[in-house]
Each structure stands twice: as structure tokens, then as C-alpha cells.
């Protein structure tokens, strides 16, 4: 009984407060999941149900015709559909791993290694968080064109292997680790590389798992319209947008394309989210 009262005091202060918080969070969750639910039911509706007014929030006659039309159209493209899948998987894996490596190494240097200009670099990173990738699109194209990387995998990989958000996230977590742990490892003769990957990284597991989720989600959505013209190098999001761009007549196919495109990031999030919550609940260091 004492534990229950203590928990109520900590979270809501009263039973009514707990109920209010639960209702607000439930409504927020429904609001966030509604677009996904809408895409799924639209992809399962036959044509005659897609254009009903007022629109229905359920499917009366479930059909897979939209997915069949999508795959049939994709199979008639210039290259096999499996090639588009390979392109997206390859780009997503390379970008995700590269972001983890570069962001972790840079965050360790900025948070645990004293060197001239570290504070200025941290400020630059914080300012960079204010800009979206769209602002840098023209500059990225100019750099890729100068390097001769247009119409190659590098054109859609290099701009995303280091992001301010990933670096900021890792730096914030690493900055919470006690300096005494780093100093003890140095006294034992450990190098910065060993300290970073064998001591620091295991203790910031929630951070790099979260970074993996965000990095994969971002990499999976890369289109590279202005960078890739070779059909054999285009990722799935680009192809799906091309297929569903025929207007309102292909509303069901567009919904099916949206479902297929967002499925892998959702699966990755489901598997990694439990690990993030578990490590956040069980880990923590204090000086």
C-alpha cells in the first residue's frame, strides 16, 4: 500500500492526476498513430470505397488489389524491383553504421578530450541544429558535382554520414559520464580509442540505440532526386513516389506504397525501442 501511494505521489500526486495523465497520453498516442492507421486502411480499400463521401475510417471489403497493382507496376520498371530494395538496404545500412561511428568518435572527442576550440565547435553544432537538410541541398549538390560523385551511391551517402542531431545526442550522453572513469582508464594505460569503444560506448547504450533508430529512419527515406539519375541506383522511396504520382486515380496504390515504405523503419523501431527503454531504466552512473 505504501509503495502504491508513493508511486501516485511521484507521478500524478493523486488518482485523479494519474487518470488525467493517462487520458492525455492515450489521446496523444492515438493522434500520432492515426496517419499510419489511415494509410493502412486506404491501402486495403477497393476503388469504390476510396472515393466515398464522407470517407469511412474502416474497410468494408478488404482487398489486396492495391498492393498487386503496385508490385505489377514496379515489376514493369526498367530494372528488377529487387534492385531498388538492394539500393535502399545498402544505403540505409551504410549511412546508419557510418553515423554511429563518426558521431560517437566526434562526441567522445568533444565531451571527454580537452583541446583548443572545443567550445566553439560545440556552439557550431548547436547552431547547425537549427537548419534543415533542405537548406543545404544546393550546396550538397555543388560539392558532389565538384567531386564527380553525381549519379553514384556516394552522392546519397556522404551528405548523411554525419549529422548535427546524432553528434549532439551522443555528446549529451557522453558528457554525463564521470570524468573519474576516463581518468582511471588512462592510468591503466588505455588509449582514447579503447576508452571510447570499450568503456564509454557500453555505458551510453541508450544513446546509440536511439541514434540507430533515427539514422535508419532518415536513411530509409533518402530519395536523392537531384543526385541519382541512373535507374539502377534509385532507392525504394524514389520509385514509390514515381509510381504513385499519377494523381487521384492511384490513391490506393499511393497508400500501398506508403505502407511498404514505412514498414521497415517501424519494425526497426519496435525491436530497438524495448532495448532503449530497458537500458534507460537499468543504467546510470554517478560521480
Residue ranges of predicted features:
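N-terminal Lys/Arg-rich, disordered targeting/topogenic segments
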Residues: 1-8
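A structural signal for multi-pass alpha-helical bundles of membrane permease subunits
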Residues: 9-287
Amino acid at each position: 500500500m505504501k509503495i502504491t501511494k508513493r508511486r501516485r505521489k511521484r507521478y500524478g500526486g493523486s488518482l485523479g492526476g494519474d487518470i488525467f495523465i493517462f487520458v492525455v497520453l492515450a489521446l496523444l498516442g492515438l493522434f500520432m498513430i492515426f496517419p499510419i492507421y489511415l494509410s493502412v486502411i486506404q491501402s486495403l480499400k477497393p476503388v469504390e470505397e476510396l472515393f466515398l463521401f464522407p470517407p469511412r475510417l474502416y474497410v468494408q471489403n478488404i482487398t489486396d488489389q492495391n498492393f498487386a497493382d503496385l508490385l505489377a507496376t514496379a515489376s514493369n520498371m526498367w530494372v528488377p524491383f529487387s534492385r531498388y530494395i538492394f539500393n535502399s538496404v545498402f544505403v540505409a545500412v551504410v549511412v546508419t553504421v557510418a553515423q554511429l561511428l563518426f558521431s560517437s568518435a566526434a562526441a567522445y572527442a568533444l565531451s571527454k578530450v580537452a583541446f583548443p576550440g572545443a567550445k566553439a565547435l560545440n556552439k557550431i553544432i548547436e547552431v547547425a541544429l537549427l537548419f534543415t537538410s533542405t537548406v543545404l541541398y544546393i550546396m550538397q549538390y555543388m560539392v558532389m558535382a565538384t567531386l564527380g560523385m553525381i549519379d553514384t551511391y556516394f552522392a546519397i551517402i556522404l551528405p548523411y554520414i554525419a549529422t548535427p542531431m546524432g553528434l549532439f545526442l551522443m555528446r549529451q550522453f557522453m558528457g554525463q559520464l564521470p570524468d573519474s572513469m576516463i581518468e582511471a582508464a588512462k592510468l591503466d594505460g588505455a588509449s582514447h580509442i579503447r576508452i571510447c569503444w570499450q568503456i564509454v560506448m557500453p555505458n551510453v547504450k541508450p544513446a546509440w540505440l536511439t541514434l540507430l533508430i533515427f539514422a535508419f529512419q532518415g536513411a530509409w527515406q533518402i530519395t536523392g532526386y537531384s543526385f541519382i539519375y541512373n535507374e539502377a541506383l534509385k532507392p525504394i522511396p524514389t520509385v514509390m513516389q514515381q509510381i504513385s504520382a499519377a494523381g487521384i486515380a492511384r490513391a490506393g496504390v499511393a497508400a500501398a506504397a506508403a505502407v511498404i515504405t514505412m514498414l521497415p523503419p517501424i519494425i526497426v523501431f519496435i525491436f530497438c525501442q524495448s532495448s532503449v527503454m530497458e537500458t534507460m531504466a537499468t543504467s546510470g552512473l554517478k560521480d
